């Protein structure tokens, strides 16, 4: 019984470590990884999974390490694409929030989101709607 409980918790943490690693990758792609971006990532992971709020620093630390060791985004997206479209849309929304956190939309950031959308089966139309939603929210 306890083994199963710990196994599920480990799976949950791994899921959020992968998501956080993708978000860290997006934050670093413009060569500037700010405290504001870290705060957005932490808040996003806490909002996605309320039970991990006490472990958020550990999750972010593991995600940063995973992102440094990885050489492709496929590793981060392969699990995320299995979840509902609403969940995947939320991930894209968080990515746009990270992109706009410094007030600019770098070409590398846009390209990354376009590639992630393809890997997560999010259409260009839905991506555009999500992008506009984030822009309106930040005004």
Which residues does each PLM region occupy?
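Small-residue-enriched hydrophobic alpha-helices in membranes
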Residues: 1-139
């Amino acid at each position: 019984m306890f083994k199963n409980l710990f196994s599920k918790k480990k799976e949950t943490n791994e899921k959020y470590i992968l998501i956080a690693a993708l978000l860290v990758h997006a934050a670093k792609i413009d060569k500037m990884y700010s405290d504001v971006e870290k705060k957005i990532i932490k808040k996003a992971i806490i909002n996605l999974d309320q039970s991990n709020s006490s472990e958020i620093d550990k999750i972010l630390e593991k995600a940063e390490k995973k992102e440094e060791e990885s050489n492709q985004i496929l590793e981060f997206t392969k699990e995320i694409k299995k979840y509902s479209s609403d969940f995947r849309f939320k991930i894209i929304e968080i990515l746009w929030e990270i992109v706009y956190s410094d007030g600019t939309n770098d070409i590398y950031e846009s390209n990354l989101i376009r590639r992630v959308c393809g890997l997560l089966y999010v259409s260009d139309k839905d991506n555009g709607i999500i992008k506009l939603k984030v822009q309106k929210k930040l005004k």
